[in-house]
Amino acid sequence: MKSNDLVCASVLSGNRNFEARVHALLKANYLMSPPLVVAFALAGRIDIDFDREPLAKTPDGKDVYLSDIWPSSSEVSETVAKSLKSQMFIERYSDMSGPERWQKIESKPSATYSWDENSTYIQKPPFFDSIEKSGELPTLSGLRPLAILGDSVTTDHISPAGSIPADGPAGKYLLAHGVQPKDFNSFGSRRGNDRVMTRGTFANVRIRNAMAGGAEGGYTKIDGKGENVSIFDASEEYKKRGEGLIVFGGADYGMGSSRDWAAKGTKLLGVRAVVAKSFERIHRSNLIGMGVLPFEFTEGADAASLGLDGTETFSIKGLENGLKPAQKAILEISRADGSKASANLLLRIDTPIEVDYYTSDGILPLVLKKIVNK
């Protein structure tokens, strides 16, 4: 596939068809019913017309068409009735204490969870670390761009759930903690460890950041100059310098599954605002719930029409007197050559409760404060 630059496809009956989800080298994935998956597997190709072409041949050379093997509704119902019994579920859930190996796991009785600093699966998340500072709005001036993305960026582009590349920031973290590549598992299985998940944010092998010169994968340039570095390494450098970050997107930013880590990882990278042409509804809400401001361009503007290349610094003005839903704001652009530009924005905080979420630095600190105050 690499040497011939092939665009290969997979067929699956799962509920996700994100790029590179089945395999990093696969660029096309199609969702379909289980019988169709079997049919395409028998055919061995994706460019087949099942109405006119046979999917296989019998041992004596006769053509076999999909219509010859497609089960009728009565056959499906009969098979389900024979193989699926209510007793199966009764037996499975009758003993909720778990198997013997589960019972042998040692645990100490305590009111709270005993965090294991050496665990690569579960770590104490930092989402409550800012509770004492909640109510203090972060500055939105001098922001550095971390990524300039296009249209239809999915939550899987932002926070992939598939395999963990050994040469990426998350893979290097696991290797440094004694985990061999064969034991990496997946991002989805390690979502209890923020150190892994933050390193995996914007690290999808198929994401394209305009700041990375056309390179595919989770790369960017610090200050928009020099060699490509990982998104995570760049964010760490900006944190050392005390500079906040901004991400630009196109239309339908955050589409796909409502993956919470797409917003959590964005927050933990140090991103303070995301500016896009439009947002998917749930991801917009999740960003606010993590204390990240979503803004939409107005008047047809976008990163391309503004000529953004990643060397700029940005400030967002118009929120100095407090936040309110659907507020107008101005994006001030300071270019590397000293010139200035601006664009009108719409704050996509849509309700008063979302104002509370943001000013509390997210929904988690807000809930904790309410519990403590009781």
Residue ranges of predicted features:
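Fe-S-dependent hydro-lyases/dehydratases of central metabolism
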Residues: 1-374
